[in-house]
Structure formats: C-alpha cells, structure tokens
C-alpha cells in the first residue's frame, strides 16, 4: 500500500481484475486486427522444492519475489496459490472468446513438480478456465534420468491427458559444456518432435500439441552460456545435426 505494507487479498483481487481487464482492453484497442489466439495468464507459480509440492500444493515460499529468489509476493499476500484460479477467472471474463488461456512453467518434467502442475491445471480445466499448458522445455541433451527424454515425454502426455492443449514454449537442449554430444542433442530434438507429431496423429485425449517455439535463432543469441550450444544453429548460423 502507500505505506509500504502488504495489501490484503481482497485489495489485490480488485487490482488483479482491473489490470487484466485493462490489459485485454488495451490490446484490443491498440491492435484491433490482431488475432490474440492465446495468452499466458500465469507463469512459473509452482515451486521446484519437493517439500512445497508435497505439502503446499506446489505454492512457492512467501517473500518479496525480488531479493528473495524463488519466493513469491503473491503467496505472501494470498498464503497459497489461490490467486492463480482468480487470475484465470478474470482472464476468461475479459479475454476475447477465441483466446486460449495458458499456464506456463519450467522444470515441468520433474516428477514432483509435474504432478503439482497437473493437479492445478486439471482443476482449472475442469472449471472451464484453462485451455492449455506451456512447457518451457529448457532441458539438457541426456537421454536418461530425471531430465531425460522419457521423463519429458511422460510429462507432455500427462498434461495432454487433461484434455487441454500443450505448447512447447521455450525449447532449447543444452550440451552443458561438452557433457553431451551433438548427436545426443539431435536425438532428443527428434524424439520430442516425433512424440508431439505421433500424439497429434493418434491422440488419447482432446488435447493437441499446437506449437513448438525454439528459444533463440542460434547459439550466439541465446540466454544460456556459450558452452550450452542449445539451439538448432551454431554461433556462425550454420545448421547443426538437430
């Protein structure tokens, strides 16, 4: 508030609704011809901490969200992740009728975090508030293990089983400074694309993989360190095996 104290959840409800309403109105007013086909309503709300996913519905620890890395000012105000459903409720109210509403997160293939995201998103989907899950997909090139190919594809299929769509929103596959080879990277890129196409050809639910976004044009223009070499083109813009 004006004195620097945390506001109540009811005050934040009003602020949230006002912001979401005005944001959608501004987009439609300033860009009347834009096809706003999808919108990321809430981003990175589930904790990486297994204790939080096991006991707090996956809500992050409360904190200011700035100096306290990994903590959430939203949880500081609401006490839990109840703000997520409120955000989707307001977004559904004010978004264009044909705009799909998404939840997006990272490390979304970790089993305990995956299950917390699934539970939250299934509840939102069942209430008619959510249309899709965004998988950020910043992953290493290993084929096995908790971040391996099977773990990733299992997570993708679990989200699709909700009945909602999935978009792979920020895909890059890191070599981790030579820990993995270009061939391993290519194999993992191929496996992910193949699994998405296979699902869409023979789906086991109403959900589809509707987009894949590669998170950068080449290795010289990446948010990752130079040794990651995580993209489809190298630093000289030459195509890699992937």
What kind of feature is each model-predicted range?
Residues 37, 43, 99-105, 117-146, ...:
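Aromatic- and acid-rich polysaccharide-binding/catalytic face
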Residues 2, 45-79, 84-85, 95-119, ...:
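Flexible, surface-exposed loop/gating regions in the mature catalytic domains
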Residues 5-7, 12-15, 26-30, 34, ...:
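Aromatic-rich peripheral "rim/lid" segments of glycoside hydrolase catalytic domains that contact
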Residues 84-93, 121-122, 157:
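Structured alpha-helical segments in the cores of large, soluble enzyme domains
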Residues 18:
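Alpha/beta-hydrolase active-site loop
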């Amino acid at each position: 508030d004006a004195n620097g104290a945390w506001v109540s959840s009811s005050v934040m409800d009003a602020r949230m609704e006002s912001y979401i309403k005005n944001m959608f109105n501004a987009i439609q007013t300033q860009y009347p011809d834009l096809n706003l086909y999808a919108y990321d309503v809430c981003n990175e709300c589930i904790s990486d901490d297994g204790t939080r996913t096991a006991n707090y519905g996956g809500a992050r620890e409360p904190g200011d969200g700035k100096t306290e890395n990994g903590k959430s000012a939203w949880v500081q105000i609401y006490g839990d992740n109840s703000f997520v459903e409120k955000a989707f409720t307001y977004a559904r109210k004010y978004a264009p009728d044909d705009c799909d509403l998404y939840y997006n997160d990272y490390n979304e293939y970790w089993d305990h975090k995956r299950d917390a995201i699934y539970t939250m998103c299934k509840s939102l989907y069942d209430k008619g508030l959510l249309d899709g899950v965004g998988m950020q997909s910043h992953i290493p090139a290993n084929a096995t293990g908790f971040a391996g190919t099977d773990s990733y594809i299992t997570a993708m299929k679990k989200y699709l089983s909700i009945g909602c769509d999935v978009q792979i929103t920020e895909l890059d596959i890191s070599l981790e400074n030579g820990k993995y080879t270009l061939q391993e990277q290519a194999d993992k890129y191929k496996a992910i694309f193949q699994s998405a196409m296979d699902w869409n050809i023979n789906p086991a639910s109403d959900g589809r993989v509707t987009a894949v976004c590669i998170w950068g044009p080449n290795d010289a223009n990446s948010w990752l360190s130079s040794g990651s070499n995580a993209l489809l083109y190298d630093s000289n813009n030459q195509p890699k095996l992937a």
